[in-house]
Regions:
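Active-site nucleotide/adenylate-binding loops and adjacent lid/helix of ATP-dependent enzymes
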Residues: 1-43, 63, 93-105, 109, ...
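Short, flexible turn/loop "capping" segments at secondary-structure junctions
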Residues: 8-10, 83-84, 226-231
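Glycine-rich phosphate/pyrophosphate-binding beta-alpha loops
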Residues: 14, 139-155, 218-219
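Short, well-ordered beta-strand elements within core beta-sheets of diverse protein domains
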Residues: 18, 46, 91-92, 152, ...
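Phosphate-binding core of ATP-grasp and ATP-grasp-like enzymes
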Residues: 33-41, 48-93, 101-133, 139-147, ...
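C-terminal catalytic subdomain
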Residues: 157-164
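Peripheral (often C-terminal) accessory segments that flank ATP-dependent C-N-forming ligase machineries
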Residues: 164-262
């Protein structure tokens, strides 16, 4: 039954993903997914309406034991061409402790069944409007959009170093569950149209919350509308004093953040 979600199984950056609400739109969604699939493999799934924000963050297992799990609040730009391309993330998540605990237990069960050992994972989860928790996707690699870096900022847990050490056969240290040190957000800078990049404006009132500004384009560079993660032009890492402060800043981005494109 509809709605459905149609996506490639081997793409990245949320490219080729479409929500389908009626049968007459299915063919176009299938063609779009195939266009972005490397090997021509796609999947059609039930679309699960979410409660709060979905989560997309990184976690780490050591010798098959899930030593560290993180959950984020994944946010989207409803005005972007790619409505399923994450436009911002924040930590902690909008889930409650019971929901996160249930997901952690199920993730551990999954890794045990798959005989996983020592690895970093990009994990997408959500809570449905029915109150049930769902594991949407588990990839045995670090996520894009600097997620492991954001987790290092927000918790101090360094999965990047741990992943490299594991890859070369060295011992892995420092992977343990730690609390979040404040309220963190990552904004994926992007343009809402094709054109030439002109400037990035951040109001003075918000500058004190900016921990890192990473702009990947220069004035005059070509930029494209936000259809996939590959269309991002940079990131903004911010830290706030409260969840309310963070939420207000993300919801009112248009008032203090502007990307000029000619």
């Amino acid at each position: 039954s509809y709605p459905l979600i149609v996506k490639p199984t081997d793409s990245a950056g949320s490219k080729g993903v479409t929500r389908v609400d009626k049968e007459e739109d299915l063919k176009e969604a299938l063609e779009y997914a195939f266009k972005h699939s490397i090997k021509g493999n796609i999947i059609v799934e039930e679309f699960i309406e979410k409660q709060g924000c979905s989560s997309d963050s990184d976690s780490f297992s050591v010798n098959g034991v899930l030593q560290f799990v993180s959950f984020s609040a994944q946010r989207f730009d409803e005005n972007a061409a790619g409505t399923f391309v994450p436009a911002a993330y924040s930590w902690p998540s909008t889930m409650n402790m019971q929901q996160e605990s249930e997901l952690r237990s199920e993730l551990q069960r999954l890794l045990t069944l798959l005989h996983m050992k020592t690895a970093v994972y990009n994990i997408e989860t959500r809570v449905g409007v029915n109150g049930k928790t769902y594991i949407m996707e588990v990839s045995p690699r670090g996520g894009g959009n600097r997620l492991s870096e954001m987790v290092r900022y927000s918790t101090g847990v360094d999965m990047i170093t741990a992943g490299v050490r594991a890859a070369v056969g060295d011992s892995v240290d420092g992977i343990e569950q730690k609390p979040y040190m404040g309220h963190w957000a990552e904004i994926i800078l992007h343009s809402d149209k094709d054109g030439l990049f002109e400037s990035l404006y951040i109001s003075k009132s918000m500058r004190s919350y900016v921990i890192e500004e990473d702009l990947w384009v220069m004035k005059g560079d070509a930029v494209h509308f936000f259809e996939g993660a590959n269309n991002a032009i940079g990131t903004l890492i911010m830290k706030f004093n409260s969840q309310e402060q963070l939420k207000e800043a993300l919801e009112k981005q248009g008032e203090w953040l502007h990307i000029s494109v000619d």
